[in-house]
Amino acid sequence: MLTKFETKSARVKGLSFHPKRPWILTSLHNGVIQLWDYRMCTLIDKFDEHDGPVRGIDFHKQQPLFVSGGDDYKIKVWNYKLRRCLFTLLGHLDYIRTTFFHHEYPWILSASDDQTIRVWNWQSRTCVCVLTGHNHYVMCAQFHPSEDLVVSASLDQTVRVWDISGLRKKNLSPGAVESDVRGITGVDLFGTTDAVVKHVLEGHDRGVNWAAFHPTMPLIVSGADDRQVKIWRMNESKAWEVDTCRGHYNNVSCAVFHPRQELILSNSEDKSIRVWDMSKRTGVQTFRRDHDRFWVLAAHPNLNLFAAGHDGGMIVFKLERERPAYAVHGNMLHYVKDRFLRQLDFNSSKDVAVMQLRSGSKFPVFSMSYNPAENAVLLCTRASNLENSTYDLYTIPKDADTQNPDAPEGKRSSGLTAVWVARNRFAVLDRMHSLLIKNLKNEITKKVQVPNCDEIFYAGTGNLLLRDAESITLFDVQQKRTLASVKISKVKYVIWSADMSHVALLAKHAIVICNRKLEALCNIHENIRVKSGAWDESGVFIYTTSNHIKYAVTTGDYGIIRTLDLPIYVTRVKGNNVYCLDRECRPRVLTIDPTEFKFKLALINRKYDEVLHMVRNAKLVGQSIIAYLQKKGYPEVALHFVKDEKTRFSLALECGNIEIALEAAKALDDKNCWEKLGEVALLQGNHQIVEMCYQRTKNFDKLSFLYLITGNLEKLRKMMKIAEIRKDMSGHYQNALYLGDVSERVRILKNCGQKSLAYLTAATHGLDEEAESLKETFDPEKETIPDIDPNAKLLQPPAPIMPLDTNWPLLTVSKGFFEGSIASKGKGGALAADIDIDTVGTEGWGEDAELQLDEDGFVEATEGLGDDALGKGQEEGGGWDVEEDLELPPELDIPPGAAGGAEDGFFVPPTKGTSPTQIWCNNSQLPVDHILAGSFETAMRLLHDQVGVTQFGPYKQLFLQTYARGRTTYQALPCLPSMYGYPNRNWKDAGLKNGVPAVGLKLNDLIQRLQLCYQLTTVGKFEEAVEKFRSILLSVPLLVVDNKQEIAEAQQLITICREYIVGLSMETERKKLPKETLEQQKRICEMAAYFTHSNLQPVHMILVLRTALNLFFKLKNFRTAAAFARRLLELGPKPEVAQQTRKILSACEKNPTDAYQLNYDMHNPFDICAASYRPIYRGKPVEKCPLSGACYSPEFKGQICKVTTVTEIGKDVIGLRISPLQFR
C-alpha cells in the first residue's frame, strides 16, 4: 500500500472522490464536512451546518454540487463554488446512513435508520419515491452504474436489489411534470409500483453494513457484522451467493470492487484493510493500523486511488506503484507495458513490442537497466517484503517479431536492485545489502565490500552511487573505494546528463544537482512530490511534480514551465518537446515554452545577443522576470520589459541611466522622484538636471548653492530677486552674501530692523554715506552706536574664473551590451527611416537597385563608376583637409635624406622573445620546474591539484631554497649589473623552446637523509626524527625522476616517512598521557599495541615490541603479551633480550588470558587514524591524505593532515607527479 495523503481529524464516516479534480470530501462524526486537495495536501474548505455526525456524502458527476446526510435527519445539497448549502430535503424520521447522486438523472438516493430508502429529485427538491421493505436500519443504498437498479443493505441481515425502471418511466413520461406538481401524493409509506424488490439476498448471519454493484459485471459485494465479505451474482430472474471471503475478525464496515482489476477491497472494525482476489477468493494484501477502526472505503472513478476513513482521520492510497519502468539510451526508449518490453524510436515515433516478459510475479516491474553493448536488460521487481525482491536478466532478440514477440528465457535471481557497471558485468544489491558483481551468465564473479547502503544507482562505467538514509556516495567498484559523497536523505531516482558531467538526485520533496565529483551545485525543495526528470540539451534539468513541469538551472534558479492534469514521467527533452510516459504506459509528447529558462541560461552564460533577441521577440512578461533581472544585477535589461513609469524610473536610477530616469520623472511629476533624480544626477555631476530637479521641487537653498559652485552669478542674482519677492529674508541675505553684494546686505539688514548690524556692515566695508545716514537714525539716549573693529578683514567670495556651463566630464566607459542596444534603439531609430524593406517597390529604382555581383558574390569595386566619380589616380579628394600647410618650428627641420625610410633613419628594435623561465613553465607540469622558474603561484596550483596541498607555510623555505638553485649569475662587463644564466637538465637537446631546468634535489639525497632519521629514532629523539621525516616527505613532490623504478622508490619513501611519523607521533603522545586511572593505563597499552602494527625497520620494531610486551605484562593481559613475545623472538633480537623475552613468554603461557578488554584486535587488519590514534578496521569508512596516504576517520575529512601539515584530508586529486613519464 502506497499512502499518498493522510489527514488527522475526528472519526470519518463518509468519503467521496471528485471525478475530475484532485479533491476528496470527508464527512466527520462531529458534524463537519471537509474538502481536501489530496495532491497538494491542503484543506480547501469546511462546511459545518449539520447537527451531529454526517454519514452520507457524494460529489455530483457534472455539477459543482455535493450531497450530505446526517444524524439530524436532514439531507443537504451544497454548491462548493458558492461555498454554501443550497437547500435541505426533509422527510426521513431517523439517522441517514448514505446519500448518493444518480449518474444520469437528477436523483438522490438516501438510506435511513427509519427502515426506508428514498429517491429525491434535487431539481424539483421533492421526494419522488419511498422504498419500503426492510425491517431494520438500512445501512447503505446505491444506484447501479448503468441499469435501473438499486442495491441496499440492512441490519435485517438481507441485501435487496430494487427495480426502479417504473420510476424512470414515470419521471420521463409526458405526465411527469403533472406528477411533480401533485408532489408526493402518489407515494404512500407502503411503497408503490415505482420501485419493486427484484431480489432479496439472504446469507449473512448478522446485520449487513454495506453493499455495492460491480462497475461492469452483474455482481454485488456485501460486508456484514458476521465478519464476512460475500460476492453475489444476479441475472434477470434470480440472484445467488457466489463466494465468501473470510479473514476479518470484527464487523466488516465497507466493501468495494476495484474499478479496473479483479480485486475486492474491504475494511473493518478490526483496524485492517484487506484486498481479496476475486478469482481465487483469497486475501492478497492486508494493511493494519494500530489504534484506529475503519468505517468507510471509496474508490476513485478514474484513477487507481482509494480512500479509507477511520477513527483518527482518513488515508488516500494506491495498491501498487504506477510508475512505468523505462530506460533511455540515445534515441531509443525501452519500457515495460502489459508484460511486454517495448521499444520507442524518438525520431520516427515507431513503437514496437520487442519481447514478451516471463510471467509469475504479481508485482509490477520496479526499475530497468539497459545495456546497449549487449542489447540486454535487467528488470527489478520489488515485493512488499523486500527480502523477496527479484531481478530478471534478458537478452533482447535482434530479429524479434514485433507482431507476436517471443518470450526469451530470462535468468531470475533474488536481489533488491541490479544495474550495469560494465559492458558484460552488472552489480546486484542482495537482501543482505552486500554488493555482488555478476557476468552475463548471471554468475557471481566477485563480492565487493561497500559502506552500509540500501539502494544502488548507475554512475558510469565501473562506478555506482550508493544510497543510505542520509547521503549518496560515489563508489569505485574496481578500486573498491569511496570517491565522494553528498548529503541528501532518501534519494529515489538518479538522472545523469548525456555527457555524465552533471547528476540530479531526486528525493520525495527535494532535488540536489551535483557535478561529476558529487559537489552540490544547487538544492531545490518542493512542497509536492517530485516524480521524474530529464536533462535538456542546453544543460537545464526539466523535472515533473505531481502537477507541474518545472525547470532547474545548475546555478539554483528554478520555475514552472506548465501545469499538468495528471502526473507524467519525463523520458527525454528536445527543443520544445517533452517526451514522457503516462501512468497507462502510453508514450506522449508535450509541447513546452522554453523561453523563460533559455532566457535565464543565456544571462548566466553571458550570451547577451541571445538575451537581447529574446527581449525584443519573445513574450516574456510579468513582474517575476523584472524582479529576477533586478536581483541578478541586470536592471538595464529589465528596462526593456517595463511600461510602468514608476518601475522604469527606479530601474533607470539603479543602472545610472539619467536620460530614461528624466523621461519617467517628467511623466510622473512627483516630488520624491525629482528629489531622487537630483541626488543621482549630482553624483554623476550632471548639474543641468540637478538644476531642473531643484527647480521642480522648489528647493531654493540648494539651487542657490548649486549656482554658487558652478559660478553662475546671473542666475544667482535671479535667485536673490526671487527670495526678495517671496519675502524670504534669510534666503535673500544668503544670496547677497554669495554674490558679495554689500549694499544689498545693508539694505536687507536695515529693512528687517537690524540697524546696528546694517551700520557695522556699511562702516566696515567703507560705505561711508550709507553709514552716516544710518548713524543719524540712532537715538543717543536710548541706543548706543556700535564700535567698528579696526582690524576687520574683508571676506569676499572668490570671483568665478571659468563658470561651469557644461556637465562634469565623465570617463568614457564602454556601455554594457544592453545599454548600447537601448541607446541605438533610441537614437538610431529616430534617424533611420521607418520603412519595411519588403514593401519597397523596384519600379522607381530601376536596374540601379540591383547590384552586379561577381562569381564570388562580391561587387566589382570599379564597375559602374567612371574616372570622374573615383577621382583620377585615386588621390585624396578636396573633402579632406590634408593639404593645408602647417607652420612648424624651425628646430624640427629634418635634413634631406633623413626621412629616407626605416632602413635609413630609424632603429626598429627586435621583438622580445620568451624568457627561459616562461619556457620552463610552458614545457613542464612538474611543480619543481615552476618553483625553479620563480612561478610560485602555478607551482602552488599544481601541488594543490596533484597532492592536495592547501597550507603552503611549511613549504616556504623549500620554495626559496629551490628557487635559489634555478639560475647562475656571472659578471659580463665591469660596472654593469650581473647577468643570469638558466641551466637546463636536458641541455643536449633543449634547443630554444624545449628547455626544462636543472634540478638540485635528487632522490639519493633524500635516501641519505633517511639514514639520519633512522639514527635519531634509534636513540629515542622522536620529535626531532618526526621533523626530519616530515622534511623528506614534503621534499618528495619536488623531485624529478627519469624511470618507473625511481617513481616506485619515491612512493616507497613516502610510505616509510608516513609509517614513522604516525608511529613516533603516537608514541610521543602516549608518553605524555597520565597513568593514574585504570582507563588511562588501558589507553596507554592500546597505543603501544597499535604502534606494533606500524611498518618499521626490524631494529625499531624490536624496541616497539619490547615496550608493548612490558606494558601488557604489567596490565596482566598475558594472552596479548605472549603474542608480542612471539613476534619479538621472530625478529632475532640480541641474546640477552631474547632470554628475557622467553621468560616472560613462559610466564604468560601459564595463564593465557587477558585481564582487561581493550579496543585492540590483533587478528583483524586495521589502519591507525593519524588524528585520533584509534584503529580503523577493514571495511569501515576511511579518508586518506592525498600525499602521505595516512588514514583518518571520516569526521576528519576536510581538515589538515597531521602527518604532512600541508594537505587536506580526503581531497580528490590527480596524484603525485614527479616524472614526465606520468604525463604520457
Swiss-Prot record:
InterPro entries: Beta-prop_COPA/B_2nd (IPR006692), Coatomer_alpha_WD-assoc_reg (IPR047312), Coatomer_asu (IPR016391), Coatomer_asu_C (IPR010714), Coatomer_complex_subunit (IPR050844), G-protein_beta_WD-40_rep (IPR020472), TPR_COPA_B (IPR056176), WD40/YVTN_repeat-like_dom_sf (IPR015943). The keyword Membrane applies. Its main location: cytoplasm. CDD domains: Coatomer_WDAD_alpha (cd22948), WD40 (cd00200). One of its GO terms (biological process) is endoplasmic reticulum to Golgi vesicle-mediated transport. The modification Omega-N-methylarginine is found at R965. Keywords: Cytoplasm, Cytoplasmic vesicle, ER-Golgi transport, Golgi apparatus, Hormone, Membrane, Methylation, Phosphoprotein, Protein transport, Repeat, Secreted, Transport, WD repeat. The modification Phosphothreonine is found at T185, T591. The coatomer is a cytosolic protein complex that binds to dilysine motifs and reversibly associates with Golgi non-clathrin-coated vesicles, which further mediate biosynthetic protein transport from the ER, via the Golgi up to the trans Golgi network. Coatomer complex is required for budding from Golgi membranes, and is essential for the retrograde Golgi-to-ER transport of dilysine-tagged proteins. This is Coatomer subunit alpha.
